[in-house]
Structures are given as C-alpha cells and as structure tokens.
C-alpha cells in the first residue's frame, strides 16, 4: 500500500543544457517532515552528482566545480550545512548524512532554487499543461507534434 508519507523524490542533471541523468522513485523510508524528505532525496542526488562528476573527469569534460544541487527547501539546506545534530535530525538514519559529509568536505555545493524553477517537479507530481510545457522545454525534450 502506498503511504503518502513515503514521498516520491526525483532529480535531473543537465550538462550543456541537455538532461543527461534523471530519476524518480518513492523514498525507502517514511519521512517525518518535508525537510527530512528533501534531505533524504538530495542524499541520493549527491551520490549521482559525484558519480557523474567522476564520469565527466574521465571523459575530460570541463565541468563546474564542485557540482551544485539546487534545492527548494531552505531547511534541508541548513540541515545539510550544519554538522551539529539537533532534535529535528537525530532520528535520521546515519547513511542519509552522506550529503552533509560531502558539503563539509567541499565536494558538493547546495543552492536554494525556488520551486517554480525545479525541473524534477514533472517527475514527482502532477502538473498543469503550462507547467508541463515549461519543464519539457527546460529539459530539452521536443514536442513531437511540432517536428
């Protein structure tokens, strides 16, 4: 049975304005808040970002250093940047603090991105037609009816 507390999460990575990696799935744990859900989702995105960074290095592509994740939840950003545990985060499984470690070590950067500009939204929730068309265009997906 699907629990609404097991939130779907997603990410998309772009290189030279083209989507090169994307994912959407239900989180493996039940998050107790939207902050926690976003934090957990960005941990998975961090793993993918670091892997893509290593692939780009291997291919000798010029990439922005360090990789940047755009997050629409300021509390999740603060949680990842603050290495001090507090009551709201002490129950989060240790494996999900990987993002915090990578931020602390300078391997990844986190930037706030308003929800209106989140490209992965189309993967995780129903969107209206105008929003869908915006996301499709930003992801570089062509409208087959206009070919």
Predicted regions: what they are:
Residues 1-147:
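Divalent metal-binding acidic/histidine catalytic loops
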